Amino acid sequence: NVRLGAMLNLTFLSRNGNHKYQLKNIFNQLATSRYTWREGVDAQSNDEHSAEYSYRSRTTYNGQLTGKHTFTSDALDWSIGYAYANRHLPDRRRYLLNDIQNPGEIALHTGNDISREWTQLDEHIVSLGANDKHSFSFGSWQPSLQMGGYGEYRTRTYNTRAFYYQWNPSICTLPSDFQQGDVTRLLSDEANMGYDRLYMFEQMQMRNNYRAHNLMGAGYAAVDLPLGKLGVHAGVRFEHNDMELISNSRDTEKSESSRHYRTNDFFPSLNTTYKFNDRHQMRFSYGRSINRPEFREVSPSVYYDFDLASDVQGNTELRSCYIDNIDLRYEFYPSRGESISLAAFYKHFDSPIEWTYTVAGGTNLIYSYKNAQSANNYGLELDIRKNLGFIGLPDFSWSFNGALIKSRVEFAKGSKEENRPMQGQSPYLVNTGFFYKNAKQQLDIALLYNRIGKRIIGVGRSEGSAASDDNARVPHSYEMPRNTIDLSVSKKWGEHWELKLSVRDLLAERVYYKQFA
């Protein structure tokens, strides 16, 4: 991996300090070159050896011009933004060897077992937002009113081209010496290339290309009401969102058709805080939010994921998921920089979007996205931040965050699916860390530990036939628990120089995915 980053921030402040302008720019370039070799058994129970050579290039840029203005009773801020991102995979090469013809004999069988692919994704985002907070004064009572708006236009283009190696069209089957030969030597020898030997042809797949646009406009109003020991913040937000997907209906020619996904929604929110004293308080909050499908999730485009050994395809019938959140939290602040909080939470999901996989074309697996009917998550969360000065370590601190979650996806009566935990949701989460901060030496060190419980990463089919057909039963795929430890060190010299060192996943434990029949 190679990462290149650059940042430029400029600030202008008026003489009276009431007007502040900032220009923020951040640029990142990430390049990843990877070779992967895999041995195992495929979905058809054939022994398989396969390899992937890939180079991935990702570019991101984010620029924003902001302004903040303070008046007698108002605080106004605004922003204008532009963002760009691309992802290029030039010449991703894959080949496949298996024993489908002769059990126990690993070999190439057709030129289609060797492929080369070029993909390119480009995305542009333009945004505009403004907010105003007006403070009222009625004697000792000082409520405030906040209003604002936001607009965003996002556009994306995605194109891919796939090529395969074929043998002499009049014969088609590879000669035996090629079937058993080394693939890299086979392709690097120019004597093997020609119209009557190995040649490369393009498989037209126009349905895998798409263009997309998304226009979102929003406005909100909120009030802050101080009522003695009770503080209330309540508001409502309206959002209009129009996503357009333009894709091809045929593979061999440009045949674009457009589909819109429009939503108009109100999202209420309520946050209340009751302060018993300066060290103890209770919070209650409610909010409604939305999880809209991404472009790739509604696109009919098919992409082969080598890590999954399966195709990945979007779902054009995908719907937005609406989420209602309720949180009750008690907070205790023993001293400055220390806190203990205990929360009970509940989340209701209407039409949650889940990552699923199923059988296609007999025995091939394909991953996609699907709406479940509904889901409920509820649980407890404990958060602790503690300085270790009481044991003679004043520069050290400890943090802990843990949660227990009960998750349940509900299906309609008579459905062939069984109630289960929501895809991607772990029954428990543990995050803890030790921190060292020496202000005099300008040195910071952090050691972090993380563990998540067993969770479904691919939803299968609970009921179905035992045969190898499109109605076959497919067990859920689980990601098993895994421990990770990260280390980061930061050292500053004066006000302008800083060196950071980060090491991720020190334990490097294996990642296990399992199915339970």
Model-identified regions with their sequence ranges:
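Short loop/turn motifs that connect adjacent beta-strands in outer-membrane beta-barrel proteins
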Residues: R15-K20, T72-A75, S135-S144, T160, ...
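Signature of Gram-negative outer-membrane beta-barrel scaffolds
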Residues: L30-A31, S115, V126, N131-R279, ...
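Transmembrane beta-strands of outer-membrane beta-barrel pores
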Residues: F27-A31, F71, Y82-H88, Q120, ...
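Gram-negative outer-membrane beta-barrel transporters
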Residues: F345-F349, I366-V459
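Outer-membrane beta-barrel signature, preferentially recognizing the C-terminal barrel domain
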Residues: E48-T66, M204-G217, I290-F349, A360-N387, ...
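C-terminal beta-signal and adjacent terminal beta-strands/loops
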Residues: D350, R451-S468, S490-A517
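Transmembrane beta-barrel wall of Gram-negative outer-membrane proteins
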Residues: N1-Y35, R58-L65, T72, P268-L270
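Transmembrane beta-strands of outer-membrane beta-barrel proteins
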Residues: H19-L23, L76-I80, P143-G149, V232-V236, ...
